[in-house]
Regions:
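Generic "edge-of-domain/loop-turn" microfeature
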Residues: 39, 153, 187, 304, ...
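Acidic, metal-coordinating catalytic segment for phosphate/diphosphate chemistry
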Residues: 18, 369-502
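Short, charged/polar surface micro-motifs in flexible loops or helix N-caps
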Residues: 12-14, 38-42, 345-350, 420-424
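Gly/Gly-Pro- and Ser/Thr-rich, intrinsically disordered tail segments characteristic of DNA damage-repair
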Residues: 1-276, 282-286, 445-502
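DNA-contacting surface of Y-family translesion DNA polymerases
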Residues: 8, 103, 229, 239-410, ...
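Short, well-ordered secondary-structure micro-motifs
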Residues: 191-192, 351-354, 425-428
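Residues at or immediately flanking beta-strands
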Residues: 177-179, 340, 414
Length: 502
């Protein structure tokens, strides 16, 4: 079988680069951060330009951290400035390098998610000039995988030259530069891009391209740390590995030879993927990804609140989310037979002494290592598949009341419609034989069922009309009374994409 060649392309600081280009600025020479300052300085930064990152600023930190780091960097510049005095500011990296008397400044650009999606679509059209859609997997808004195995002979180019040709076309078309990784499988091209390319100098256009095969991976990355730099190795997996004496991928590979059972004991079936990656193997192809069909499907909605909510106010938000999720089901022609609700509590429940004294339940740690009350989680089943707003809203409200601690502040919530199917594929009710008895009024039952069917049909017409109006006039063209109550978030979220300004 012919050896495969894959290219992974990551658009450099994508959101920040778009904002620079729209201002006529060079993304490689401009200090800019994409963040919604109206949400306070605790808001997460969606992107940071490379020049601003050079001051030790994380690409996904919070705005107050950016301001603090710039303040610290300016303190250092002042010490080294002539007369220990800074005179003027600049957000251009080249000016700051040339003039030590200038203070570091930066632009805060509010996010425009719809605009970034438009840019991403334009860039995807560039990829299509070179590669067929069946050989492209869109990994995220700013990252793709390309199977270029059958294109190298066609273009009479090496993988490196083809990657460069595509990236320079993107640069010419949009002004956005990129980093690329080339590998003999999807894992290796991703790791080449994420790890190796970061440690090689960029060319004059800011482009970095790195290559890996299995043997080069073992030679160069078996000793690399930290483990979390590797694709699909999160903090939880890395912590377990380190607790068992494995600090590098080389350690994992060695363990797989000497004590494979330990890895399966720690990670179950997921150990197979970890072992493969430790050796630089990845059998999954783009063709396999394209052909994959999950055995079970779901639709979900999640939200992190800007501040802690009392349970009753949080219930309002859950009802709003459920209402919109049901409309999404109807719009897609889907039905569900199970709703799942997860409620995450706020750190204030344990940092506030009075609240902590009242709480005696289980405690867990959030992603930042802080103690919080254990999240609430539950599910509720229907006797058949449905997309009825009335039925689903009642079920989720009942589930909320059942699982949520009424004394705790809520910070995050997730609503999931499970086992979704196309309505035409859903099992029909009353399809089998019915056991008759002498004590049931079947005429009354039949009338009751007719009334229920009529109510569902009326509801379906209302749902269809609501969707039609929202599509024509915008998501906020029709609002319910609950959307106008104090603490409601749907109206604002309707103007967002992915929780950020559209």
């Amino acid at each position: 079988m012919k050896d495969k060649t894959y290219i992974a392309i990551d658009l450099k600081s994508f959101y920040a680069s778009v904002e620079c280009r729209e201002r006529g600025l060079d993304p490689l020479d401009t200090n800019l951060v994409v963040a919604d300052e109206s949400r306070t300085d605790k808001t997460i930064c969606l992107a940071v330009t490379p020049s601003l990152k050079s001051y030790g600023i994380s690409g996904r930190g919070r705005l107050f951290e950016v301001k603090q780091r710039v303040k610290e960097a300016n303190a250092g510049r002042q010490l080294n400035a002539p007369g220990h005095r800074l005179d003027g500011t600049s957000h251009f990296f080249s000016e700051l390098q040339a003039n030590p008397s200038l203070a570091i400044d930066f632009i805060i650009a509010p996010p425009r998610m719809a605009y970034y999606m438009e840019y991403s679509t334009r860039i995807y059209q560039v990829y299509l000039k070179y590669i067929a859609p069946e050989d492209i997997v869109v990994y995220s808004i700013d990252e793709v995988f390309l199977d270029v195995t059958d294109y190298l002979n066609t273009y009479q180019l090496s993988a490196h030259d083809l990657a460069m040709k595509i990236i320079l076309d993107v640069l010419e078309t949009t002004g956005i530069t990129a980093t690329a990784g080339i590998g003999t499988n999807l894992f290796l091209c991703k790791v080449a891009m994420d790890i190796v390319a970061k440690h090689i100098p960029a060319d004059k256009n800011g482009v970095r391209i790195a290559e890996l095969d299995e043997m080069k991976f073992r030679r160069e990355l078996w000793t690399h740390q930290p483990l979390t730099d590797f694709w699909r190795v999160g903090r939880g997996i890395a912590k377990k590995l380190e607790q068992n004496g494995m600090f590098t991928m080389g350690d994992v590979a060695l363990c797989s030879e000497r004590n494979e059972d330990l890895l399966y004991k720690l990670f179950g079936k997921n150990a197979e993927l970890l072992i493969d990656h430790a050796w630089g193997w990845e059998p999954t192809t783009i063709a396999a990804i394209k052909a994959y069909r999950p055995s079970s499907n779901s639709l979900s909605s999640g939200q992190v609140l800007h501040c802690p909510y009392e349970p009753q106010k949080a219930k309002l938000v859950v009802r709003e989310m459920t209402d919109l999720l049901v409309l999404d089901l109807v719009d897609k022609g889907l039905v569900t037979d199970q709703m799942v609700l997860t409620i995450g509590y706020d750190i204030e429940n344990l940092t506030d002494q009075a609240r902590r004294a009242r709480y005696h339940g289980a405690v867990e740690k959030d992603p930042y290592g802080r103690e919080i009350p254990k999240q609430a989680h539950g599910s509720i089943n229907f006797d058949g598949h449905t997309s009825s707003t009335r039925k689903i809203m009642w079920a989720v409200s009942e589930l909320f009341d059942r699982i949520v601690d009424k004394n705790l502040l809520v910070r995050r919530m997730y609503v999931v419609a499970n086992h979704v199917l196309p309505e035409a594929d859903a099992p029909k009710k009353n399809g089998g034989a019915v056991q008759l008895d002498l004590f049931t009024d079947y005429a009354a039952e039949e009338e009751k069922q007719k009334a229920e069917d009529a109510a569902l049909e009326r509801e379906r017409k209302i749902q269809a009309a609501t969707l039609a109006i929202k599509k024509k006039y915008g998501k906020n063209a029709i609002l319910k009374a609950m959307n106008l109550e104090e603490g409601a978030t749907a109206k604002d979220r309707n103007a967002q994409i992915g929780g950020h300004k559209a």
